[in-house]
């Protein structure tokens, strides 16, 4: 079942497709299977789906995403999760070659599928034969969130996913843009993910189209950042946006954007668009504050 679906994606993909993008695309049916397992299982269906894959599958984010992220109210039982998932893949999906690795912190589970050789994507000894899917399972950090249950249809079935709502995800993304400690290689001096830049711009576009009725869940943002003022948070974000290295943004996004033309167009316009969007959000916040005082 798994091999056939991956082979179908290969057959539909053009030969000129960016190989990094292709490997990410191959993860999508694997993501669907893990999500079906999680949300059809009585022990795990309370998990809160979050992150870029949540935004793509439930809210239409126009880029690929590679990992599955879950927040858990309470303390996650990762050992049971791994054992139950291995049984599901082996017995229900009839795929018996998957192995798993758990990180030293115990919150990151990597699923290893040795499928790339038979798909024709191993060309030398330097190429890995393994397609990796990471699941990050963490305790929900603040207790401040909104959640909703949404149907998710895949090629095989439909099930119901418990996920953060858009204001919560917007707030988490803004906090990640400012607070994430991530660098890609030794040449990156400022910590950020290009994916956070893309996603934040997408959120701000949606919010602006709704005349700023869509806002980050500000109590969550302030709790995650240890901040006390929404306007100051937005100003910090605008300062960071103005100083981004666009080549590093593009390098991080390359496995998730289909064409180099689209990637170049995005990275070329970051410094003009993102600070302006954040300035507009600041103006909307100040206008709202003035309205509350009168």
Q: Which residues does each predicted region cover?
A:
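Structured mid-to-C-terminal alpha-helical surface segments
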Residues: 1-47, 58-61, 73-294
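Glycine-rich beta-strand-to-loop/alpha-helix junction loops that act as flexible
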Residues: 50-53
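Anion-coordinating catalytic cores for phosphoryl-, nucleotidyl-, and glycosidic chemistry
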Residues: 65
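Structural signature of FAD isoalloxazine-binding scaffolds in flavoprotein oxidoreductases
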Residues: 70
